[in-house]
Amino acid sequence: LPPLLAAVGFALTLALFYLGLMDYDARHVYLDAQRGFYGDWQSPVMTLLWKLIDPLAPGPASMFLLIAALYWLGFALLAATLARRSLALACAVPLVALTPPLFVLVGVIWRDVLMAACWMVAMALVYAFHARERWLTAARIIALLLIVFGVLIRPNAIAAAPLLIGYALWPASFSWKRTLALVVPAMLVLVVTVRLVYYGALHAN
């Protein structure tokens, strides 16, 4: 039932917000994607992503669909995991996703929303498999990639990333002490990663 409610939420998102809302910044990124120009005023990684997915649904629709799918996937994973403990609590999760402070942003094509959706999936994935050792390593790897991707989308959110990395590494025994020890090295690695990807791989201007 909870995943079904999430699917209904996704359908409602499409009905209300399709094709998505583009502001000036998003339009700028989309036009750069069409030209194959990677500037660092916005995220060149988002520009590349949009260029890759645009043939699936040209225009704002491709990015809107990706954001909406990630948003509802994250809540569906969380709901399905909580259903093992409480069906009522699990059913409440998709309803939380529909509350105005969250839901009204799903249709807005902002890199902040894309980053948040990626991080939501990352945390929900690790939480879903934290007690399943067989799948936990794969869940960790995917989560860490999503966290790094979120930083590449929104570099000034880098300070929040070590907390998420800490949970991804130690979901069953999260420790503030270990996570705080991770802050400086994680941020240094992420700063270097951003520079290597932006200016080394994509030659952003």
Name these PLM-found stretches:
Residues L4, L78-P100, A116-A117, W135-R140:
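Transmembrane-helix signature of polytopic, membrane-embedded enzymes
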Residues L16-V29, F37-L49, I53, P58-A61:
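Extracytoplasmic catalytic/substrate-binding loops of multi-pass membrane glycan-assembly enzymes
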Residues Y24-R27, M63-L70, P94-V126, F149-A160:
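Multi-pass, polyprenyl lipid-linked donor-dependent membrane glycosyltransferases
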Residues L65-S86, V121:
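Transmembrane-helix motifs of polytopic, lipid-linked glycan transferases
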Residues L77, M115-R132, I142-A143, I147, ...:
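Specific aromatic-rich, kink-prone transmembrane helix
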Residues L87-A90, H130-V148, K177-L182:
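Short hydrophobic alpha-helices at membrane interfaces in multi-pass membrane enzymes
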Residues A139-R154, I165, A186-V191:
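Membrane-interface alpha helices of multi-pass inner-membrane proteins
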Residues R178-N205:
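Juxtamembrane membrane-water interface segments immediately following transmembrane helices
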